Amino acid sequence: SPAWSGAQTFFNPALPESERLAAVLQREIRETLANTNRTPLKNESVYLLKALDMPSALVEVGFLSHPDESKLLADEDYQKKVAAALYRGILRYASGETGKR
């Protein structure tokens, strides 16, 4: 739907470290891309998140159904910004950050 936009991070609430990972990633996405105010959401139905016994998060970086976001997602510079945000988020998670400021 064109009504939806912005990156969204999901986690399995059964693993507390997954929530921390999702929070750090979502915060970095919000700060770097400055196009969403979303917060991480619990998701107990995604198989991969349920099956893994290690911290994990699913990041949907945008909506192809949203015309403006679809253009951004096709832009190489924007793709690099998204990748950099995820990279920095993983580094922050590994260093022990909580995702809160």
What are these regions (language model features)?
Residues 1-101:
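Active-site-proximal helix/loop segments of hydrolytic enzymes
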